[in-house]
A protein has these predicted regions:
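N-terminal membrane-anchoring/stem segments of glycan-assembly enzymes
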Residues: 1-78
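Long helical/loop segments within the catalytic core of UDP-sugar-dependent glycosyltransferases
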Residues: 135, 139-140, 149, 154-156, ...
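Acidic donor-binding/catalytic loop of UDP-sugar-dependent glycosyltransferases
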Residues: 122, 126, 174-189
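Acidic donor-binding segment of Leloir-type glycosyltransferases
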Residues: 99-149
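Short, well-formed alpha-helical segments that are part of the catalytic scaffolds
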Residues: 69-70, 91-104
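Cell-envelope/extracellular polymer assembly enzymes that use nucleotide-activated donors
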Residues: 80-83, 111
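A structural helix-start
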Residues: 88-96, 116, 120, 124, ...
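Short aromatic/hydrophobic "clamp" motif used to bind/position activated sugar donors
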Residues: 169
Length: 240
């Protein structure tokens, strides 16, 4: 109810502000219906831009404050066992590369669990070839495969979590890759018992087109900066 009231108040204030702007600047515009509509549209876009600028400013401010004050204890002997769960659906063309990136991680105490969510291509056959102990950066890494009927990503993740016996779980998509330092950098935060989850920095690999550049910008603003700002107020409600 409070959220609804806040939205109503915000909408009301913006509407009143827009009306006042149009009213006081109306004498300087042409008195045709088309011109009035055009002017009202420009004013609306201007107000929207102002709101966005304030939003980005406060996001950057709170993200900076959080990153500036956040500290964690360092323990060079803290390397808990981690299960990396990879749910896949029709990822036959990329799953091998994704698993190859996981085998290069700068970490030794982990396993990889592939969950095939009823794929209709050759995903199961490709994943099956990866099962067993594969050579990692420091030691052999166990790769397991769960084959289940299609039920969606959530059920696939739950199947992997149920299979895992590790202290920590890392979930990633079948068409994604992790940088080598991911586990070492992420796991160190869990030495603080108050930490419940850690999100990574999502980056777009194939930034060759305008669309992918815009997608990368969306990740930076919508995930990285926004989550850091939310962390300052202890209001993060979803990972990532």
């Amino acid at each position: 109810k409070r959220k609804i009231i806040k939205r109503m108040i915000s909408s009301g204030i913006l509407s009143v502000l827009m009306v006042f702007i149009i009213y006081f600047t109306l004498p300087y515009t042409m008195f045709s219906l088309y011109s009035l509509f055009e002017y009202a549209t420009l004013v609306s876009l201007f107000l929207f831009l102002i709101v966005l600028l304030f939003r980005y400013f406060f996001l950057l401010l709170f993200a900076y404050l959080y990153l500036n004050e956040y500290t964690f204890k360092r323990d060079e002997g803290f390397y808990p066992f981690v299960s990396i769960i990879v749910p896949v659906y029709n990822e036959g063309k990329v799953i091998a590369e994704s698993i190859a990136s996981l085998l290069k991680l700068d970490y030794s105490n982990y396993e990889i669990i592939i969950v095939n969510d009823g794929s209709t291509d050759n995903t199961f056959e490709v994943a099956k070839e990866l099962v067993g102990f594969q050579k990692g950066k420091y030691t052999d890494i166990k790769v397991s495969l769960i084959n289940k009927p299609n039920g969606g990503k959530a059920k696939a993740l739950n199947a992997g979590i149920s299979y895992s016996k590790s202290e920590l779980v890392l979930c990633m998509d079948g068409d994604s890759e992790l940088s080598e330092e991911t586990l070492k950098v992420a796991v160190r935060h869990f030495i603080d018992p108050a930490i419940g989850a850690v999100a990574g920095n999502v980056k777009v690999l194939n930034r060759k087109k305008l669309f992918t550049d815009l997608q990368a910008l969306e990740y930076i603003e919508g995930l990285n900066i926004a989550r850091a700002a939310q962390s300052y107020g202890r209001i993060v409600n979803i990972i990532p």
